[in-house]
């Protein structure tokens, strides 16, 4: 067995901890030993279906109580798991089926495992000639034990954001998971006997699948897991579960914490729940906005939320999950730098007066990872030099599976180009400024879309997290940009004119450049990934 599966199966046999699912209406708790026994039955069914070492299996299941034993069963069979993108009630199933079959063909899936609430997809998949297995049928099989699996066998094929159309899957090995899991254990100062993890993150995203399902299953950690739909129906369920189970650890993207802050102010009163047990509230998967963190701390103070609990972090599917964690108990650490020097000279010079930019530091690198910052000539930059972040280490993916075949992620020396622009502080802490492909270059200045979007989001009437800055004329000598925002008042001409004017005003005040145009759209118009990130490249048609 690999180190990953050996430790996971050992902890399943010895741990008294487990996983609570089904909140808020039908909570049920299974110990990791019970999850393992269910996995052995599913593994028996997989063996009968011909699934074995090296096979790839797609999974379309919505409930963590079924995803956990299914994932473990696939690893017992030496197979790898791909969580397929899930259709929503508004999804055109015919279009979804075509996109999904493209992914299934690319990964050469041996079968697809389907469970509630996606059983409606079974006839569609079978019509396409796919072998479909259900969790219910697999659970009825005779249990078997694990087969021998190597360190470099694939465990996960993580679909990247926006994978439909031109899909790409990040290949994650047993070695990758083991290395990143052990590093996160140290970085989070994890205590198996005391810590309780609470999560609503989706299992089709790396933070939900790896960080808040695979990792607790691997270490035998106590986990309370609900679905994204549960969170969307009642944002405060997140806080209620932390209170009920005395949760100590959670994680989410920046937008979710901003939404929680709003709900705490509008719908809760002190005494409704206690958040003082929370010691590790990781913010990742999208840029961490210091103002949003500070707003959450202000809204959460009456409920016992401690400033030291907030933990900005940096990660990506290509490193299995995590790259750096802020130091435990340090809280938000802001690096305030001269915005003009940052834009013009690509230097992050500390400043407290004049035109400054506040950036969240994302902590030191986790163990077994190295980072360097590279300039446009390929030279390594010193501390506070802004360039492309490159990474190297044992948790780093060997590469991607694409429609054209395998593409290695690492150069001949093992370095991976993240596509992120950022710098390292004198202490070696990571700071991310933006994505190379999204940066707008005007008159030799680097203008970051996140700055524009933050300014647009300050305008009254703009929906939170629903402003996107789009680069125009990319590749020409003179670039420009446009801004699209969503508003509930998109059909009111007077309100639209006001919002357009105020967005332009706020953007000029923030970055000293006027957008070519501002477009006000209805709710749900701006394209986002399944995990809620803005799809800037896909937004061009909205503003042109």
UniProtKB/Swiss-Prot annotation:
Protein keywords: Isopeptide bond, Ligase, Ubl conjugation
Cross-link for Isoglutamyl lysine isopeptide (Lys-Gln) (interchain with Q-Cter in protein Pup), residue positions: 528
EC number: 6.2.1.-
PTM summary: Pupylated at Lys-528 by the prokaryotic ubiquitin-like protein Pup, which probably leads to its degradation by the proteasome.
GO molecular function terms listed in the Swiss-Prot or TrEMBL record: adenylyltransferase activity; ligase activity
Database matches in Pfam families: AMP-binding
SUPFAM superfamilies recorded: Acetyl-CoA synthetase-like
Protein's GO biological process: fatty acid biosynthetic process
GO cellular component: peptidoglycan-based cell wall; plasma membrane
Gene3D superfamilies, per database record: 3.30.300.30, N-terminal domain of ligase-like
Superkingdom in the source lineage: Bacteria
PANTHER family according to UniProt: DISCO-INTERACTING PROTEIN 2 (PTHR22754:SF32), DISCO-INTERACTING PROTEIN 2 DIP2 -RELATED (PTHR22754)
Protein family: Belongs to the ATP-dependent AMP-binding enzyme family.
Name of the protein in question: Putative ligase Rv1013
Primary gene name: pks16
